[in-house]
C-alpha cells in the first residue's frame, strides 16, 4: 500500500525532489529492486486477453516468470545492475492491513461470481475484479528466485519488509537506490526511490526518481518529522486520523514538531477530527526507524554469467516455455554481460556535482583552445575533464587533448556518466 498521497505531496510541495529519466540514464547503477512488488505487477500486467494470466500447458501460471525474465533483461540491456530483494515475514503490526486486504479479496470474489453468473459484466469489469484477486504466492517467489539465480542476478532474502532492506542497502552504499512503486521506501530511508522500472516499453513511462534529501528540504522537515508525517498520512501499520489528509498533516507536523504534539492538538480540535481507537504510532515509528533488515556487512552482491543450460532446462523443460524464444532471451542476456561489467566514471573519481561556475569555466576554456567544436563540446561535457580540472588544476590545453580523445556525439558511443 505504501504511504497515502506521499508522491503527490512531494510533487506539490517539493517538486525539485522528483526527476524523470530514461532507463539508460542508470547505466552502471546498482539498484535494489523490491521483488515482491515486481511479481505482483507481473501477475496483473502480463496477461493473455480475456483468458487472464499466462499459463503453460499444465495450467500453471507463468506471468510472473515471463515478466521477470524480460523486464530484467531490459534493465540489464540499459546497463543497470539489478539486485532483487524478497519479503520475509510480515511485521505483526501489519496484521490489520493484511486483514483488510483479505476482506477486499472476498468482496472482489463475490462480485466476480455475480458478474459471471448474471452475464451483466463487460470483459473490462470481469478483468478488473480478477486483478483484485491477484496475490503472489510463496511458490511464485521461489520460481522467480530460481530464474534470477540462473540469470546470474543477485537475490537477497529480507528478514521482514523488502523495501526496508532495499533502503538499508542503499544507505550503506551497496546500491544507488530502491526500485519499487511503494513510497514507504523513502520512509525507511532510501536516498533514492526509483519508480516505473517494470513498466512495459509500450506504456512509454519515464523512470521517476525521488530524492529523499531534496524532499526533506522542500517539505522543510527533519527525517524524524518525515516519518511521523508518513504515519499520519496513513501507512501499512496504522489507520489514518479522520479529517487529516496530506496537506493538513504536513501543516500540523511543521507547527507541532512531532506526532505527540499533533495528537495533543487534534484532541482539542473537536469531533471533526477522530483519532482511531487503535493508533499505534510509536510502534509504527519504530518499524520505520529501526526495521528488521539484513546485516549489510554480510551482503556480497555479485552479477555472474548466466547459466544457459540451466535456463533452457528450467524454462523449456520444466515450465514449458517456447524453446526458440528462450534461446533468443538467453542471447540477449549474454550480450548484457559486457555492459554490466562496466562502471560509471564516478566510481573512479567519486560523485560529481557540477557547479554552474565550473561548467561555464570548462566550456569557455575548451572553446578558446579547441578549433574543433565537436571536440570542445565533448571536452566540456565530460565528467572526466571536470574531475581532472578539480584534482589537478589542468589548463585548457590538456582538457582539450582529452576532449579530442573522447567519442564524438553521433558515433554510436555512450557518453561517460
Give residue ranges: language-model regions.
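Extended two-metal-dependent nuclease catalytic cores across DNA- and RNA-processing enzymes
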Residues: 4, 55, 96-299
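Non-catalytic, usually N-terminal nucleic-acid engagement modules in DNA/RNA processing proteins
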Residues: 1-106, 113
Amino acid at each position: 500500500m505504501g504511504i497515502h498521497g506521499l508522491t503527490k505531496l512531494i510533487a506539490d510541495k517539493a517538486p525539485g525532489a522528483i526527476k524523470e529519466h530514461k532507463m539508460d540514464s542508470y547505466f552502471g547503477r546498482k539498484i535494489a529492486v523490491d521483488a515482491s512488488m515486481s511479481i505482483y505487477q507481473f501477475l496483473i500486467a502480463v496477461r493473455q486477453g480475456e483468458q487472464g494470466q499466462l499459463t503453460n500447458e499444465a495450467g500453471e501460471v507463468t506471468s510472473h516468470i515471463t515478466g521477470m525474465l524480460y523486464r530484467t533483461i531490459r534493465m540489464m540491456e540499459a546497463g543497470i545492475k539489478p539486485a532483487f530483494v524478497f519479503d520475509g515475514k510480515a511485521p505483526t503490526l501489519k496484521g490489520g492491513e493484511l486483514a483488510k486486504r483479505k476482506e477486499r479479496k472476498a468482496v472482489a470474489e463475490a462480485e466476480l461470481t455475480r458478474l459471471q453468473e448474471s452475464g451483466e459484466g463487460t470483459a473490462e469489469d470481469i478483468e478488473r475484479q480478477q486483478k483484485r484477486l491477484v496475490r503472489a504466492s510463496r511458490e511464485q517467489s521461489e520460481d522467480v528466485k530460481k530464474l534470477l539465480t540462473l540469470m546470474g542476478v543477485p537475490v537477497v532474502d529480507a528478514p521482514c519488509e523488502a523495501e526496508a532492506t532495499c533502503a538499508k542497502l542503499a544507505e550503506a552504499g551497496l546500491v544507488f537506490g530502491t526500485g519499487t512503486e511503494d513510497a514507504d521506501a523513502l520512509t525507511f530511508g532510501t536516498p533514492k526511490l526509483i519508480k516505473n522500472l517494470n513498466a512495459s516499453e509500450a506504456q512509454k513511462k519515464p523512470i521517476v526518481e525521488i530524492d529523499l534529501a531534496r524532499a526533506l528540504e522542500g517539505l522543510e522537515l527533519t527525517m524524524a518529522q518525515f516519518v511521523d508525517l508518513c504515519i499520519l498520512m496513513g501507512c501499512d501499520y496504522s489507520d489514518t486520523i479522520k479529517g487529516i489528509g496530506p496537506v493538513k498533516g504536513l501543516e500540523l507536523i511543521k507547527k507541532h514538531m512531532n506526532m505527540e504534539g499533533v495528537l495533543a492538538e487534534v484532541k482539542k480540535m473537536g469531533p471533526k477530527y477522530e483519532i482511531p481507537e487503535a493508533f499505534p504510532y510509536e510502534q509504527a515509528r519504530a518499524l520505520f526507524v529501526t526495521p528488521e533488515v539484513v546485516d549489510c556487512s554480510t551482503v556480497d552482491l555479485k552479477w555472474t554469467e548466466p547459466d544457459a543450460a540451466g535456463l533452457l532446462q528450467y524454462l523449456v523443460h520444466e515450465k514449458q516455455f517456447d524453446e526458440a524464444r528462450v534461446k533468443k532471451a538467453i542471447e540477449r542476456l549474454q550480450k548484457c554481460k559486457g555492459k554490466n561489467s562496466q562502471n560509471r566514471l564516478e566510481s573512479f573519481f567519486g560523485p560529481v556535482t557540477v557547479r554552474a561556475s565550473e561548467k561555464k569555466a570548462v566550456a569557455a576554456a575548451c572553446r578558446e583552445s579547441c578549433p574543433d567544436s565537436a571536440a570542445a563540446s565533448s571536452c566540456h561535457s565530460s565528467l572526466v575533464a571536470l574531475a581532472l580540472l578539480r584534482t589537478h588544476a589542468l589548463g585548457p590545453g590538456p582538457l582539450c587533448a582529452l576532449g579530442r580523445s573522447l567519442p564524438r556525439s553521433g558515433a554510436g558511443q555512450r557518453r561517460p556518466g
